[in-house]
């Protein structure tokens, strides 16, 4: 089910989606997982890796962040996973925003306004129905949508979307002001923001422009 939902989301966004062979809720930063991810990164040859920090709320998320860190230094090592050619560069690693403060708060190094992307995000979430129309309504609000029609379930998610006042905290607002000026930044309700990981390469001018439009 989750694989079908992921492919439907990928089709909407026009992206490639590859699912690694680890069960939902059971991922650990094991040697097997590290080498699988290392081979995958080498095959894709990404300029930038987006991931969550290793202090995220979900154990799978924490493990993923740790695995990316564990892979970073060894991506160029020819003796590690010698069946895949090593990278001759280190990708940029960016963490997306989270609200957690332990061991330290998220630091927004770059941000971009995302108010115009809300409808696309809504459509993506609708395609991940088992998450956004089944599990999260129950986990967050104890709302059971089982037995409801698809239209009723989407209407619930739409109401949640429209009631959302925004995701721009003080640190992200300050980042937006530095980049775009206060007049523009203070009108932004929703934004994407990223923290640069010290385990990856520094952000160059081309990527900075791609992320911010500046």
Positions of PLM-derived features:
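Proline-aspartate-enriched helix->loop->beta-strand connector
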Residues: 33, 37-55, 59, 64
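Active-site rim/loop-helix segments in enzyme catalytic domains that contact anionic ligands
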Residues: 1-44, 74, 195, 203, ...
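A structural motif
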Residues: 87-103
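Divalent metal-coordination and catalytic microenvironments
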Residues: 6, 17, 49, 68, ...
